[in-house]
Swiss-Prot record:
F-type ATPases have 2 components, F(1) - the catalytic core - and F(0) - the membrane proton channel. F(1) has five subunits: alpha(3), beta(3), gamma(1), delta(1), epsilon(1). F(0) has three main subunits: a(1), b(2) and c(10-14). The alpha and beta chains form an alternating ring which encloses part of the gamma chain. F(1) is attached to F(0) by a central stalk formed by the gamma and epsilon chains, while a peripheral stalk is formed by the delta and b chains. Belongs to the ATPase B chain family. This is ATP synthase subunit b. InterPro entries: ATP_synth_B-like_membr_sf (IPR028987), ATP_synth_b/b'su_bac/chlpt (IPR002146), ATP_synth_F0_bsu_bac (IPR005864), ATP_synthase_B_chain (IPR050059). It is a single-pass membrane protein. It comes from the Bacteria. It comes from Aliivibrio fischeri (strain ATCC 700601 / ES114). It is found in: Cell inner membrane. Its main location: membrane. F(1)F(0) ATP synthase produces ATP from ADP in the presence of a proton or sodium gradient. F-type ATPases consist of two structural domains, F(1) containing the extramembraneous catalytic core and F(0) containing the membrane proton channel, linked together by a central stalk and a peripheral stalk. During catalysis, ATP synthesis in the catalytic domain of F(1) is coupled via a rotary mechanism of the central stalk subunits to proton translocation. Component of the F(0) channel, it forms part of the peripheral stalk, linking F(1) to F(0). One of its GO terms (cellular component) is proton-transporting ATP synthase complex. One of its GO terms (molecular function) is proton-transporting ATPase activity, rotational mechanism. Keywords: ATP synthesis, Cell inner membrane, Cell membrane, CF(0), Hydrogen ion transport, Ion transport, Membrane, Transmembrane, Transmembrane helix, Transport.
Length: 154
């Protein structure tokens, strides 16, 4: 072996020792710090993805609940509408029947009044006719009795 090779080996050993002592630790520290940042970033991304999935599921559940509640409210409104319509229909039928009954009563009353009036007129005409036939005058009291009699018979 010659001295040059030995000098180069010693210089190389010193260079490796110097690098291992002063250069290598900061490089390793920077690499480890970078690895830690990357790992933290990846775990944060995974957590964010999980949180996003959870938020989407929660939003989906809330949307389903809101749709269900809206459907329930619509069904209740339709039931109430039907109930109101049925009540109004029943009230209208009762009012109709009341009006018909009242109209029939008024009609019957008017019919009876007209019938009585007609009876009186017929009785008066009969008395006048009988008076003319007999050509004699009947006193007022006798005429009233005859009219009442005829009215009762009609």
């Amino acid at each position: 072996m010659n001295a040059t090779l030995l000098g180069q080996a010693i210089a190389f050993t010193l260079f490796v020792w110097f690098c291992m002592k002063y250069v290598w630790p900061p490089i390793m520290e920077a690499i480890e710090e970078r690895q830690k940042k990357i790992a933290d970033g990846l775990s944060a991304a995974e957590r964010a993805a999980k949180d996003l999935d959870l938020a989407q599921a929660n939003a989906s559940d809330q949307l389903k609940e809101a749709k269900r509640a809206a459907t329930e409210i619509i069904e209740q409104a339709n039931k109430r509408k039907s109930q109101i319509l049925d009540e109004a229909r029943e009230e209208a039928l009762v009012e109709r029947q009341k009006i018909l009954t009242q109209g029939e009563a008024e009609l019957e009353s008017e019919r009876n009044r007209a019938r009585d009036e007609l009876r009186k007129q017929v009785a008066t005409l009969a008395v006048i006719g009988a008076e003319k036939i007999l050509e004699r005058s009947i006193d007022v009291e006798a005429q009233k009795d005859i009219l009442d009699n005829i009215t009762a018979k009609l």
